[in-house]
Amino acid sequence: MGEYNNKGIVVAGGNGQGNKLNQLNSPSFIFVDEDQCVYVSNGGNHRVMNWRKDAKEGIIVAGGNGEGGNLNQLNSPTGLSFDDEGNFYVVDCWNHRIQKYLIDI
């Protein structure tokens, strides 16, 4: 078995807990696509964010309109997944639903 470098590199957040575009609050799940974009379920901020490779801040791709049950809101997203048609799905935990989005970044 090979050796590992045990020094991590911050690829999203890392600027303390908060709701600015360069911060996360209770991230719970990530997905990394073929372009090395990192998608983060950011439960404490009720949003899903996309961090492009080497970005200093993320882009809100779902939620981000406060905690709530409207279609443009999330309540503690805890997971996400993608299909092969360009849609992504968010586990909207405390709204007891799965939301589907077409991503266009």
Protein language model annotation of sequence segments:
Residues 1-2, 50, 100:
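Conserved blade-register residue in beta-propeller folds
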Residues 3-28, 54-78, 105:
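Gly/Pro-rich loop segments of beta-rich domains
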Residues 32-35, 82-85:
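Residue-level detector of Asp-centered blade-edge/turn motifs that repeat once per structural unit
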Residues 38-39, 88-89:
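Conserved beta-propeller blade signature
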Residues 42-44, 92-94:
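Conserved strand-to-loop turn within each blade of WD40 beta-propeller repeats
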Residues 46-49, 96-98:
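Structural signal for beta-propeller blades
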Residues 85, 93, 100-105:
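Long terminal segments
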